[in-house]
Amino acid sequence: MTSVWKRLQRVGKRAAKFQFVACYHELVLECTKKWQPDKLVVVWTRRNRRICSKAHSWQPGIQNPYRGTVVWMVPENVDISVTLYRDPHVDQYETKEWTFIIENESKGQRKVLATVDVNLAHHAGPVPAQVPLRLRLKPKSVKVVHAELSLTLSGVLLREGRATDDDMQSLASLMSVKPSDVGNLDDFAESDEEEANGPGAPEVRTRGPQSDLSRELKTLCEEEDEGHIRPQQAAARPSSAEDTSPAPVSAPAPPVRAFRGQGSEPAAITGGQVGPETPEPPPSPPETRSTGQPGQTMVPTPAPRLRKGSDAPSSPVPCSGDEVPNTSEDPPTGMGSSGETQAQISSQEGTEAHEARPEPDIEVRGSKDSLGGERSKVEEEERGDGPGASGTGNREKNTKKSDTTAGEAGESSELHQVDAEHKSKVQHRATEGPEAAGLTPKARLGDTPEAPPRSAQRRMGVRTQEEAPSDLNPPPAEPEEHLGDLRDARPAGQEKGSAEVRSKVPAIGRAGPEQGSSARAASAGPQVSCVQTVPSDGQGVKSRDQRAQEAEVGESRVLETEAEWVPWEVIGTSKTDAGIPESLDTEAGTAESEILEAQESEAARSEGLEPEAAGTAESEVLRTQNNEIVVLGMPRTGPEIREPEEFGETEVGGFTVPDTKTVIAETEILETQGVVDGEAAVLKTQAEISETQKTEAGEAEAGTLESQKVAAEGLGAPEVGAEMAEAEKLGVQETEVEIWRIPRIETETAGTETLGIHKIGPPQMQPRLVGDQETDVSVMETAEDAILGTREITAGCGVLLIEAKIPESKIDRSLETEEGDLGVLEVDTGIAEAKILGIPERAPGVQKALGAGTEVARVLEAEAASSEVPETDAEEAETLQAKERSESSVALRVVANLPESELLGTQKTEVGGTGISQREVREAETEIPKTQEISSEGSGVPDLEAKMEESGRKMEIWETPEVEKVNSELFGTQKGSEIPELETKTIKSEILDAQETEVRDLGLRRGEAEKAEAEMLETQKMEAKTARDEEIELVDPGVSSPEAEALRVQWAGTVVLESGEVKADILGVQKPGSWGALKYEALDVPVTKQRLSGAKEVVPEVPRAQEPETKVLGIVEAKSWTLGQQEAEMEGFESPENKSNIFEAQEADSGVLGTMKGKEAVESLEEAGLSKAQVASEAGAGVPRPSGASSLEEPEEDRRLPGSQAPPTLVSSSQSLLEWCQEVTNGYRGVCITNFTTSWRNGLAFCAILHRFYPDKIDYFSLDPLNIKQNNKQAFDGFAALGVSRLLEPADMVLLSVPDKLIVMTYLCQIRAFCTGQELQLVQLEGGGGSGTYRVGNAQPSLPDCLDAGDLAQRLREHGAEVPTEPKEAVNRGTGAIPKVASRDTDLSCSSKDGEAEVAQEAIPQEAPTDGPRARSSTTPVVPAEGLVNGVGASGGVRLRRSSVNGEAGPVPPPRAHGSFSHVRDADLLKKRRSRLRNSNSFSVDDQDSGAAVGAGPAGPGAVEGPNPASSPDANPLPAPVPQQPPGGPPPTEESSPSLGEEAGLQRFQDTSQYVCAELQALEQEQGQIDGRAAEVEKQLRSLMESGANRLQEEVLIQEWFTLVNKKNALIRRQDQLQLLIEEQDLERRFELLSRELRAMLAIEEWQKTVAQQHREQLLLEELVSLVNQRDELVRDLDQKERIALEEDERLERGLEQRRRKVSRQLSRRERCTLS
């Protein structure tokens, strides 16, 4: 597998391509007495390249019969092409060893006998050469005594160029990449889809050859070869693969897992499994093929592979658009393969599945087949058990029910495929799910005939309502029959599959939502679902009532049995699903548009659904969803998408779909209530939607469906409600347990995945919901703008409050229509929420999901009660969750504790007072009405606030409005109109997280919580410190003391400065105060706790208001999670209070999250901090995310800093990176980012980022989406021109079906760091080449104007080289401020972990001052803003390397007070100045850098050069021209290689060349250390990505990886600077020598000169002119760069001035608050 790090190491190097030819002459082999070789083969190999000689006989010798030889009478030549690399300043190529292996070939098997390595670099040269070699090989077998090989090795240089040139890449190396993520069909060229859509597609699918085509489409195919086997083939060789029925079930689980980790590989594996598994279905496939009907769909089962779409040859696909896709999907994929393939399919299904449905299995096949395959496997297995016959039987397209019944196997698999492929389809089915779901069989029947056209539509990404119904129709009748089968299969190892099948069967038999959920579930473990689906299809003939009843009965059984299985299976699957969901998201997106249409039609149909049928479908859905909660979350998106069709499609790529679902679910609930109040039609539609959504979400699956049905039916289906309630109770309890378990996994997955919001099953669903929410937000905002926003905000802001109070009102209304149902719904939702809650800690994306799941969280509370159906169970579940929470996040737990106790108390009271179901339902209803009211009001904040106050959660509600504003401001900037909702949702997620954590973890009693809260609030008011201490104490109780301490320490270190401020804030105004407390307390949960508790207690109004703000801040934090950056934003925010609060709260929240994670890994806290900062910065990247003022500032500050508020700092998590990418590409045509692989394949996303920051570099609107190579080339060339290390080549995106995830992530990490100005700058290298000191980036936040260079330098020196991290001078100035600053810088710097670690490392070497710089280096640019980099010499003296100073004083690097230029610019400026000085003969040493003189010190030139010529403190600037050269390293870059302090003196006497050599040596040592660690990290990271085993560890490694990459790039930049120095120095030296000689010549009289002398003089003059021109060119470049840098400085100064004023206002306000 190609090494990302090796590519990074090649940046800036030279490459030479050689052709080596080995000519074998003789092989001598001596063996033991008991053995002699048969045939010998000489293999020349490296990695995955093998060049073998022909097999030759071994002839024993006459003298020694055991010593034989192989002699080539005619020399045999083998040739290889090798690319060798070298540093530009070194002639020797880097080592590259190829191995000669002697192998014995016997009976077709080969055994290695001996090997020897040959370093080709030793035989490479510019001149062709032949070298005779006699190599002595090392025996690798006990049978070999001695081996020698004689050959001639010749090497010829083919071409030379830069290591990053396209033609220098090794194709073999490229192709050795193993894609580690599943691709979304949406992201692939549409030509594939068109092929699949072709009328003959179904037939083609039937043909075996097409599988090859698919394979060509996807490199992964090779891995999936077995899976690709046609159905017949699969049947033929079932033994070779896993057993059809049992294996499939077991297989799917692993595939899912693999899928999560590396979508493609697992998919491939699954495919292999599929073939064997398919054997059972194969018989039916033949029928299917002959019949060409839905039943035929099963035939494709053998060929579930995407590549093997041909397998899907199941003509059955043609039978109906829906069925066909399913068929190809189902039959082709075995259970196992479907699991993995599903993931792929999920991603790709959206586009390809839809398009290829009818005949698309070639493309869709891969993804669909995977998803469908698993299901189909399950279905097939079941079919084999009993429904097989029906599956085999052909069904009429017209009677989809009969089709489903007769060919349920085929169709159910088909449906599953569709489900996986199309969340929209799932939605349709869900609507239709009950079969009576309102899409009557008639609609389906009608659709069935139309299936082919529909499939075509699907291909286009549009799904007709009819289509959905046809898919949905299949399985109503046989659930009972097949339940037995399913159960039987489960023991066979299909437990997972069973759970999934359960969900799927309900999905098929029930409604689109169910199927959607089941589809997702199916992707995780669709086998069972498929099985069930078949049975339900089989009974499709039965009356709806019968079917409904049977479905309920069977499902309840399944739910009971499966629910138990599912919890674990789902959990395991969840992780797997985590990966699948990404794909599903895309699918969902594509299918969403279709689903929207389908949903609309389905909504009508659903309205028409019979109560019983609805009930049945709902109960089925509920059970299925309960089992599949993790997976179900995704289907939820489908229904949601109904409303926002456009959004669904647009946001399909992202997790927006999920958001929409959540939003829709909430909206539906709200609307349902509102409709109940005011709009019956809307209520029905939304009820249906929520029905689908909830069902899919698995939150209130049965209850929601029921209530939805009731709503659709005019709230007139109490019967169904009752039934649903019962079924729900059964499934819900088990499901809850499952969910409780799942949350952990989800949390880990989400956290690890980060970008992998999708990876978390339920959380994933939630992330999708979040995405949908955004989409829906737009759609829904249009219809219910206020409602959604307010509601979401309410949910997000005051989840606890809303949970406690709103749930009642919500439930009350719902109770009328869906009393029993809602209870169940809430329970399910609660489960999902639990997962979600766990997830939010982990990933911003998850947080979004949580936000979307805020409603779910509320439901969770109700659910806690309702699921408490056995109250004990619910409480236990809560306790478990609480434990998990506490483990995952101490801080969060504490925070949650306070509200939780309240919530618990409320919930318990409600539960105890009323039947759990009723109470919960009432709560939910109450919530809904309240939310609705708020949303309808538009400003609903007052209402919410009032209600919240009533419930003691007023504060939270109040906060909600604030949050809305803030969120809308922040997110509005970032994501546009969608952002507010997203933020709200994020907030919701965050609050939810905290609340749920509180509920589960603390399980504190309301009284205790209130007391704690009151104490906390009082403490905060009393004293910031006291408050902080108390908060910490509170946190400690909530969390283990060590953890709390660790959190505190980490955050304290990171946020110490801010914490001081925050303390004041906390003490002063609780809004800011609590924020600060949260933020700084390491969010010791107490602050958050206070926040929540404050809201709960309602505390005094002031605290309440503060609480809301706090909450808002916390929410904002949650929103951006990333908002960690909001610290900077705080500074940048126009409204200092809110913004600062937000900023602090965000940091606090991050701390909490970090703490949560920290329980698992204390590092997590730091990570959270980094993530926060990063996310914040990322969000900031949206540009002015903060209030308008801040928005203005940000643009001013730096175009490259989208979120310049709090400079993004370095990327800390894959999720934050993914979100940043989504944010900056938002609104670009054809760009839909859902992952780090296929979303980037066509190059449009890269081009969009380039265009976003550098519109002049590329004409985005002229790009052709189908011209993959050219698009990528333009983007890569553009970034390379800007200085971004080129890790990717167009070939990477073209040759690999799924681009390498790690390479793409690494490249994007570099792009983000560059575009946001957060690149690390090398500040100083330790003499021994030990750890170097780095600083975050461009110093974009340059020194505030208020800090003049002199003042700053002086202060830094005084404080041990402390550098003000932020413009907050007051804090920095504080005596204790320095350490705080350093730690805070570290926090800001993006990788809190990294920063802290670095600080720790360098603190010692650099001394306290070093600590400051260290922090600075790792800190956000805020500190760098000063632009001064203080290097601390061994002496410990502080040197402000940064501003060197006057142009004359070459020694000091150009002052970059504003740090706007990158360190590279500094170097350039230095060189330029030096050049000028030299030109002017001004080599005089300008020591000018007395430490104090820094401010004015540098000579006039210094002042001129930089606004703040912070001359490096005198330690640095030893006079002497030499110093000029050392300064060559721009201050930001690195100071002299040796410790600047001590060596400064030496440097003045050193020659520039000596200085450069010493620095280069130190750089090499530093690089060696980084390279060693990077190799380990990459190896571990790839292993974890492929296995998906430990998401938490993966995320930790990703953060470390990003840090290493940033350090490596800093070293590369510094090396480039040194190279320029060397060139300039060389020019100077030559100029000096030429000038001296020329002067000597000119001293001779003209008449005395000989002809030779005259000629020599002419040559000297020409050379001199040439040198001058070259130097001028260098100077021109430097001038250009410097001018740009100065312009940036001016712009930054204005922004910093505003920020400074803001900060001062904030500080004064905090002081007042503290006093008060």
Swiss-Prot record:
SUPFAM superfamilies: Calponin-homology domain, CH-domain
Pfam hit, one: NT-C2
Gene Ontology BP terms: cell morphogenesis; enucleation; erythrocyte differentiation; establishment or maintenance of cell polarity; mitochondrion localization; nucleus localization; post-embryonic development
Residue spans of biased composition, Basic and acidic residues class: 351-380, 394-403, 413-432, 479-490, 542-560
Chain spans, region Interaction with BIN1 and AMPH: 1399-1549
Superkingdom as given in the UniProt entry: Eukaryota
Protein name: EH domain-binding protein 1-like protein 1
